């Protein structure tokens, strides 16, 4: 510890302990950062991001992921390719996110644009998960139906917080990267806790029991809808709904025709689609193959929780070092690293790690940390870019549209990965061609580099759409619309309304 003596004006001196000062900065730095965001963006926005992303999606999502994998494998007893294809279906509600966005923007219920949808999302989530957890011998497709309903509940809650981030990114462009860092850190910390508990909980209460526990994060969503402050919209004419839907559709189509919008959107879809998802094949090999590690449930959860540290490191690295770099350069290097990181899975499948004296447990922990860190670094600049592509007036709906394109890419990736596992005959008991699936996936991850010309070269803090696309209003229109915007976006600022 270093101690320095500094002179005071009155001739005295004070001892400054640098070690303690640095430690205080490390501890107080994040607190000051959160206070700054709360001051600039309103405390309820920060609270909403932490609640929905940290608890509902981070903690609840990670628990649900592990529970779903074991539920499909041990309860429904499906093949890995079938499991991957079926679970991808549950993501369909995320593809139609623009519908939820339009509903919350233009269709108030009992005079409120946001509160009823939060309450509805929470109720749907609680009911669907209770049905899965309490029903014995539930048919596969009925279970899939209720999983899709719970996914829809999470998507409805998510779309409101989405719009808030998009709106604030436009009003505070210098804080766009900070907002994405907050979202990522909340999600990563929640996932860290969720994955850490997931294996233990699956072992203690089973996958169906975990579904029952997941009702609590959804109950929190309903509580958020009950307690947050939102201005009441008096005398709303429901005859306007059809016209507002039409206007929103025209505005989205007009914006999508702009090359500054459709080009990066196309790149995001291609990048996600070509990164073939073969997770279920690897998961079955980790847990069931005699030639594999044969990990227990607790071990799987612990490995995934440690892997979440990679996401936290990525969010921290992005916030401190990478948030000011150009979009195209970041996409180039993260995509290259993403392809190279997949080779770790190939080393594991060939069991080369054992030849170098590295046990499976240690190697997979390193693999998971590296994979999640690079995956998060690859994703964050795309999120920032997405938030900056949203025009005024339809921030929530258009952000939902762009994110639905990304979710469509993820679903396509899962389906293509499932098809590849099926073609290569990777089953519950046969894993002879799993190495080939991993190799093909790694090569496919390089192909998006051919489409980097679609990504803008601009800096993350200064990039913006042309004014004619952003839809700036005249002075009279601003005065006329200010009240309406305050009503429709107050929940974005005064509660937990959009990401």
From Swiss-Prot:
Membrane-related topology note: Multi-pass membrane protein
Keyword hit for Membrane: yes
Top-rank taxon, per record: Eukaryota
Location in the cell: Membrane
Main location, first listed in the record: membrane
A GO CC term assigned to this protein in UniProt: membrane
Keyword Nucleus: no
Assigned keywords, A-Z: Membrane, Transmembrane, Transmembrane helix, Transport
Family indicated by similarity: Belongs to the major facilitator superfamily. Folate-biopterin transporter (TC 2.A.71) family.
Protein name as annotated: Probable folate-biopterin transporter 2
Species annotation: Arabidopsis thaliana (Mouse-ear cress)
């Amino acid at each position: 510890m270093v101690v320095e003596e500094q002179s005071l004006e009155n001739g005295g001196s004070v001892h400054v302990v640098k070690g303690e000062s640095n430690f205080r900065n490390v501890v107080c730095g994040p607190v000051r950062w959160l206070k700054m965001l709360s001051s600039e963006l309103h405390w309820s926005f920060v609270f909403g991001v932490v609640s929905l992303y940290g608890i509902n999606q981070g903690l609840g999502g990670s628990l649900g992921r592990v529970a779903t994998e074991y539920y499909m494998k041990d309860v429904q007893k499906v093949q890995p390719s079938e499991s991957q294809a079926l679970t991808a279906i549950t993501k369909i509600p995320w593809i139609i996110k623009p519908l939820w966005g339009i509903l919350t923007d233009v269709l108030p219920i009992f005079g409120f644009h946001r509160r009823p949808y939060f309450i509805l999302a929470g109720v749907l989530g609680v009911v669907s998960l209770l049905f899965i957890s309490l029903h014995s011998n539930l048919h596969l497709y009925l279970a899939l139906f209720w999983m899709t309903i719970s996914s829809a509940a999470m998507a409805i809650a998510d779309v409101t917080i989405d719009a808030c981030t998009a709106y604030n990114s436009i009003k505070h462009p210098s804080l766009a990267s900070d907002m994405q860092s907050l979202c990522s850190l909340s999600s990563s910390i929640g996932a860290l806790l969720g994955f850490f508990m997931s294996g233990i909980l699956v072992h203690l209460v089973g996958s169906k029991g975990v579904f029952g526990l997941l009702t609590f994060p959804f109950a929190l969503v309903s509580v958020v809808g009950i307690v947050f402050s939102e201005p009441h919209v008096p005398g709303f004419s429901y005859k306007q709904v059809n016209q507002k839907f039409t206007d929103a559709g025209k505005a989205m189509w007009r914006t999508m025709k702009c090359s500054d919008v459709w080009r990066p959107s196309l790149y995001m879809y291609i990048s996600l689609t070509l990164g073939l998802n073969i997770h279920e094949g690897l998961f079955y090999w980790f847990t069931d193959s005699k030639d594999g590690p044969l990990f227990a449930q607790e071990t799987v959860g612990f490995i995934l929780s440690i892997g979440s540290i990679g996401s936290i490191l990525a969010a921290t690295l992005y916030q401190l070092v990478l948030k000011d770099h150009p979009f195209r350069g970041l996409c180039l290097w993260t995509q290259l690293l993403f392809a190279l990181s997949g080779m770790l899975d190939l080393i594991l499948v060939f069991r080369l790690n054992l030849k170098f004296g590295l046990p499976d447990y240690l190697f997979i922990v390193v693999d998971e940390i590296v994979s999640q860190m690079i995956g998060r670094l690859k994703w964050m600049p795309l999120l920032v870019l997405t938030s900056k592509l949203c025009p005024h007036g339809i921030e929530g709906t258009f952000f939902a549209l762009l994110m639905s394109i990304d979710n469509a890419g993820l679903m396509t990736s899962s389906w293509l990965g499932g098809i590849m596992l099926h073609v290569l005959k990777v089953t519950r008991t046969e894993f002879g061609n799993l190495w080939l699936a991993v190799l093909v996936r790694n090569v496919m991850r390089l192909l998006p580099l051919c489409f980097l010309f679609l990504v803008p070269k601009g800096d993350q803090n200064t990039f913006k759409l042309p004014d004619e696309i952003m839809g700036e209003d005249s002075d009279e229109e601003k005065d006329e619309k200010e009240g309406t915007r305050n009503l429709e976006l107050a929940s974005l600022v005064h509660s937990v309304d959009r990401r």
